[in-house]
Every structure is written in C-alpha cells, then in structure tokens.
C-alpha cells in the first residue's frame, strides 16, 4: 500500500514537468514567429542589408591633397666634398732664423701680405759685398776704356803696335763681362734679401702655424711655415653615375651655366649655390662614376674645405607637370597607384606612371589629372569604393581621431 502511494506521486511529478516543458516550447515558438516579420522589415530598411548592415561604423579618417600643375626642376644628385680652390704650403726659400710671424691663425690674407721674416743680416752683408765688387769693376772698366781711347789715337800715328791695341780692346771686353757678372751677383743677393720677407702667394685663409719664432728654418723644410687655403672662391667635387653624363653634356650645350646647390649632411639645409665648373676626363671603372667640379663664391664662408655635402645640379625644368605629395604614391602588385577621392569622398585605386620625385613631391605623368584629390595618410585602411572622412593634417593625430581610427580598424570600412 505504501509502495503504491509513492508510485502515484512520481507519476504526478513527471506529468507536471512535461506540461511545463510543453508550455515553454510553445511560447518560444510564438515569440520567434512574431519577431521574424520585424527582423525582415528591418533588414529591408537597412541600406546595406544583411551582413553588410551589421558592419556599419565610423568613416575611416584620411588626409588628402590636390594634384596641382606646376613647373618642376630636374636635379642630378651626388655626394661630394668641399675642396679649396688652391692649397699652398708657405715655405722659406732661404735658410736662416725665423725672426717674426705677421699673421693670426685663421685670418684671411691677400696675395702679397707679409707673413714672416727671416733674419736678414747675412743677406744684407752678401748684397753689400756684391755691390762693392760691382763698383770696383765698374771703375776698372772706366780706366780700361780710357786707355783704349788713347791707344786708338796713338795707333793712327803708329806710336803703338796693332797687337797692343787689340790687347787693350780685349781687356775692355773682359771687364764689361765682369761687370755683367757683378750685376747678376747683386741681383741674386737682393733676391735673397727679399726672400727673407715671406709673403702670401695667394688670397685665402691661413691655418695653424707650423713653426715658432726663433727656430732655424731652411728651404728644404717640408712642413713649411703655414698652409693657406683659398676659400673665395671654393670648389665642390662630387660624383655622378656614368648614365648621367649624356644629360649633363646636353644641358651644357644649351649654353647656360648649370646651377649646383650644396646641401648639408642631412640634406635638410641649403648651404650655398654655385655653378658647374668642369667634368673629369675619364670614368672611374671601379665605381662607374665620374667626378664633377662646381665652384662657389662662398663670400659668406658657408662652405669649408673637406666638408661633406650633398650636391644637387639643376639640368632641366619640366613645365606643366602634375604634382602630388610623395606620400600619396603607393606600390602594389600591378605597379604604382594612388587612392583618388571623388565628390562623395569615396576612394578608388588609380594606376599611375610616376616621373621626377623627391622626399616631398612626385610628378605623375599618367593616371590622374590636375585637380584630382589623392589620399596622403590613412592609406593602409582603404578598400575600393570605401567612403572616408577627410580630416585636416594638423588634427589628424588628436586623441579623438586616434580613438575613431582604432574603432574603425575593429569594425571595418563603411561603403
């Protein structure tokens, strides 16, 4: 009896659970059916529909620039070194004690300026001796000429022999030769004295002195007294690939001087501007380059000997060229391309043919026209036909736009 009672309770519990489960199943099905028309309607009203509607999010922020038409100079570039137009080691041409230096290290001097003095005492003595010998021989010559005149008169009356007359004539000629030798000795002694005063052979800047006052110096010293570098003007020697030779020669034939610019080591600051002076007469077979020399006035002393610079030589100017920022030019499997914005700020990929370019701008020879807008920043997030938001360059890195950019990267572009 007790077992029968428990069995009835088990049956009741099972029936209740089954009823509850059936109710939940029926209720869930009705909810699903009632929600379906609304979902369908929402999908129909969504512009993108289906899965694309779920991807809607903020527009991709980009920066853009307009292609412009302008004259673009064509430069040939190379690495070079500044060299003095002339470098002279000032040496003494006579032996003696250095008595004085008349320059300040690093100063600019003119040709003929006194730089140093050698003790002139010995040269003055030698000059005086030569001058004394000359005076003595001149007196001897004068006396010999008087004797010759008397001999010539006596020879007319046969008071002297022809032999005596010839001997006197020979003595006069010999003394005249001695006079010429004496005059040369005087000139040599005077030259030695003049050389005791050492002057600048060229205009330029003197370097550090190589010898101190009081030292004995000679004409054989290799170090010299000081080195002068001529920096007004000054030269730039740089190299160009042999493939550029024809371009340079053709530009020279135009008859106008080719402008050469010297830029600093980082290629960010223009130091000076000069003109092409000459090309070397042969190509370096090892490097396949040719040396080129340009000359600069350098009146502002912007260039210094042995200074490393970047050279830029203007060889041509391309007129009416379509120019865009270099940042807009991209490279893909199909070649160079840019992202072009239409009036609705939707982007499309255009294959282009680039021309002259540098770190700032590039000439586009085909693919776009002047007035087209191209994307310069935010390119990595673009897809064909995507609509974007064009932002100003100065506000492109604000925290708000950075957050928008991150959100866009998560959700995808909106078409």
Swiss-Prot record:
It is found in: Cell inner membrane. Residues 31-47 have a biased composition (Polar residues). Pfam families: HlyD_D23. It is a peripheral membrane protein. InterPro entries: CusB_D23, Multidrug-R_MdtA, RND_pump_MFP. One of its GO terms (molecular function) is efflux transmembrane transporter activity. Induction: The mdtABC operon is transcriptionally activated by BaeR. Residues 1-21 form the signal peptide. The keyword Cell inner membrane applies. Residues 31-60, 392-415 are annotated as: Disordered. Keywords: Cell inner membrane, Cell membrane, Membrane, Signal, Transport. It comes from the Bacteria. One of its GO terms (cellular component) is plasma membrane. Residues 399-415 have a biased composition (Basic and acidic residues). NCBIfam families: PRK11556.1, RND_mfp. Part of a tripartite efflux system composed of MdtA, MdtB and MdtC. The MdtABC tripartite complex confers resistance against novobiocin and deoxycholate. Belongs to the membrane fusion protein (MFP) (TC 8.A.1) family. This is Multidrug resistance protein MdtA. It comes from Escherichia coli O8 (strain IAI1). The gene is mdtA.
């Amino acid at each position: 009896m007790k077992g029968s009672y428990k069995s009835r309770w088990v049956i009741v519990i099972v029936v209740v659970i089954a009823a509850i489960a059936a109710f939940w199943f029926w209720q869930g099905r009705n909810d699903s059916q009632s929600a379906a028309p609304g979902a369908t309607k929402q999908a129909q009203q969504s512009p993108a529909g289906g899965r694309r509607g779920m991807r809607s999010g903020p527009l991709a922020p980009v920066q853009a620039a307009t292609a412009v038409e302008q004259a673009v100079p064509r430069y040939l570039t190379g690495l070079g070194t500044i060299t003095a137009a002339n470098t002279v080691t000032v040496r003494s041409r006579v032996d003696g004690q250095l008595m004085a230096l008349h320059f300040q290290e690093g100063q600019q001097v003119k040709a003929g300026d006194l730089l140093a003095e050698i003790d002139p005492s010995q040269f003055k003595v030698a000059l005086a001796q030569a001058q004394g010998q000359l005076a003595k021989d001149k007196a001897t010559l004068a006396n010999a000429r008087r004797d010759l005149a008397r001999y010539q008169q006596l020879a007319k009356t046969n008071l002297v022999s022809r032999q005596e007359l010839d001997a006197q004539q020979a003595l006069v000629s010999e003394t005249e030769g001695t006079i010429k030798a004496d005059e040369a000795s005087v000139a040599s002694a005077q030259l030695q004295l003049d050389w005791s005063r050492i002057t600048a052979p060229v205009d330029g800047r003197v370097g550090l002195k190589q010898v101190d006052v009081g030292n004995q110096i000679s004409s054989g010293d290799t170090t010299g007294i000081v080195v002068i570098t001529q920096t007004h003007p000054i030269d730039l020697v740089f190299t160009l690939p042999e493939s550029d030779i024809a371009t340079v020669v053709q530009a020279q034939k135009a008859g106008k001087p080719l402008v050469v610019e010297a830029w600093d080591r980082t290629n960010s600051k223009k130091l000076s501007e000069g003109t092409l002076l000459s090309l070397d007469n042969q190509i370096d077979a090892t490097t396949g380059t040719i040396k080129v020399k340009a000359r600069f006035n350098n009146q502002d002393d912007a260039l210094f000997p042995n200074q490393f610079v970047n050279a830029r030589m203007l060889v041509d100017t391309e007129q009416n060229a379509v120019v865009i920022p270099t940042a807009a030019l991209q490279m893909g499997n199909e070649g160079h391309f840019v992202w072009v914005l239409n009036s609705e700020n939707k982007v499309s990929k255009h294959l282009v043919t680039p021309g002259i370019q540098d770190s700032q701008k590039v000439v586009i020879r085909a693919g776009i026209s002047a007035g087209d807008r191209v994307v310069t920043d935010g390119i990595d997030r673009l897809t064909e036909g995507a609509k974007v938001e064009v932002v100003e360059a100065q506000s492109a890195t604000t925290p708000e736009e950075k957050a928008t950019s991150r959100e866009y990267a998560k959700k995808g572009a909106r078409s």
